Regions:
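Short acidic, Pro/Gly- and aromatic-enriched capping/linker segments at domain boundaries
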Residues: 88-107
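Catalytic core of tubulin tyrosine ligase-like
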Residues: 26-75, 80-90
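Cysteine/selenocysteine-centered motifs that mediate thiol-based redox chemistry or coordinate metal-sulfur cofactors
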Residues: 140-194
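Charge-rich, low-complexity N-terminal segments
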Residues: 1-44
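A hydrophobic, small-residue-rich beta->alpha segment in the mid-to-C-terminal subdomain
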Residues: 103-146
């Protein structure tokens, strides 16, 4: 595979596309995807799963040490930005997932966390942007993720998939936005998770 395209749908209309070259892909085996890219000296590692209702982004330095960010209006600095999302669907050199609004921000200790955007999740339900099945699975995914964090297993869980160590992550490619209408794998009523 020369490149991998990661389609990340943020309903109702924002389909973001991230492109990764072969050097960025650390794992892609149908069950999990792990990619990383350098954003000006800070490395962003992205984990997506075929059987879990969340994705996780981790910031490190090039030596593999965790780096915390403080981005307003978030109430805590964080290293792990966990998105409740549909499981990824792989299609040739692309993966697709739908962000389901709820975020879990976790500090570098892997234990201190904050759950945010639950109000946006409620609004999405009211607007019909996700199905009842997706809403129930999102709640279960949030419970599973919090359980991993509270059992002090987040770092071990991610390290088992791909150890944290020094990296030669290539520079990130620019993110693009594309029309949702062209991609039924993320469109309401036709996506597999609906």
């Amino acid at each position: 595979m020369d490149r991998l395209l990661d389609y990340d749908f943020h309903p109702p209309d924002d389909l973001r596309v991230f492109m990764y070259g072969q050097q960025s892909v650390l794992r892609s085996d149908g069950t999990a995807l792990v990619v990383e890219a350098d954003y000006g000296g800070t490395v962003l590692r992205h984990y997506a799963f075929a059987d879990r209702w969340f994705k996780i982004n981790v910031t490190t330095d090039r030596a593999g040490n965790f780096v915390e960010e403080q981005a307003d209006p978030n109430p805590i600095p964080f290293c792990f930005n966990c998105d409740i999302a549909t499981p990824m669907v792989a299609d040739r050199n692309a993966v697709f997932a739908v962000d389901l609004w709820v975020d879990v921000l976790v500090r570098a200790d892997g234990l201190t966390y904050y759950v945010g955007d639950e109000d946006e999740f409620a609004d999405a339900m009211a607007n019909g942007w996700l199905s009842e099945r997706e809403a129930d699975a999102a709640r279960a995914g949030l419970t599973e993720l919090i359980d991993i964090i509270e059992r002090k297993q987040l770092i071990a869980f991610l390290s088992e998939l791909q150890p944290f160590r020094s990296t030669e992550a290539p520079p990130a490619n620019a993110m693009r936005r594309v029309p949702v209408s062209r991609f039924p794998l993320v469109h309401p009523y036709s996506r597999p998770s609906w």
